[in-house]
Regions:
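Sec-dependent bacterial lipoprotein signal peptides
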Residues: 1-22
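Short alpha-helical boundary/capping segments at helix-coil junctions
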Residues: 3, 22-60, 88-109, 114-142
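Alpha-helical interaction segments
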Residues: 12, 27, 78-81
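Mature extracytoplasmic domains of secretory-pathway proteins
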Residues: 68-74, 78-95
C-alpha cells in the first residue's frame, strides 16, 4: 500500500510541474528594439536611432568628413549603394542617431573616397556598421 502511495505522490508532483510549465507568465520579458526609425517629414529619408547595446553589438564606428587635396574625404567603408546605384553615407547629427545623405564620389584611393559633393567637412559619419544601418532603415533582414 505504501508503495502505491509513493507512486501516486510522484505522479501528482510530475503532473503539477507539467501544469505550471504550461502557464503563461504575466511578467514576460520586455522586447527592446535595437533601432527606432522615424520618417523625416518632407523627404524620403528616415532618422535611425540605435540603442547603446545595438551600437556595441555592431561595433559601430564613426569618423569625420575631412579635406584632402581640396576635396572632401570619407572612409571608403562609409559608402553604401542603393538599388538604383546611388551612393550614400550615414551622417550622425547627434549621438546614436544616423541620417542617410547622398554623396557624389569623384574617385577612390586606397581606403579613402574623395567626394565631389557631400556633407560639410567636420560632419560625423558612420565608418563601420553602415550596411547594418541601411538594413535597419529599410527593415532588410528583419
Amino acid at each position: 500500500m505504501q508503495y502505491i502511495n509513493r507512486w501516486f505522490i510522484a505522479l501528482l508532483i510530475i503532473a503539477g510541474l507539467q501544469i505550471t510549465a504550461c502557464q503563461k507568465h504575466s511578467e514576460m520579458h520586455e522586447v527592446v528594439h535595437p533601432a527606432e526609425i522615424v520618417k523625416i517629414e518632407g523627404s524620403d529619408l528616415s532618422k535611425v536611432t540605435l540603442t547603446e547595446k545595438a551600437i556595441e553589438r555592431l561595433a559601430l564606428k564613426t569618423e569625420q568628413v575631412r579635406e584632402s587635396k581640396s576635396q572632401k574625404v570619407v572612409p571608403y567603408s562609409s559608402l553604401i549603394y542603393d538599388i538604383n546605384g546611388q551612393t550614400w553615407i550615414y551622417t550622425s547629427p547627434e549621438s546614436r542617431t544616423f541620417v542617410r545623405a547622398k554623396v557624389d564620389v569623384d574617385h577612390v584611393e586606397g581606403d579613402l573616397a574623395y567626394l565631389n559633393d557631400g556633407p560639410p567637412v567636420g560632419t560625423v559619419v558612420a565608418s563601420v556598421g553602415v550596411a547594418e544601418l541601411y538594413g535597419a532603415e529599410f527593415k532588410v533582414g528583419h
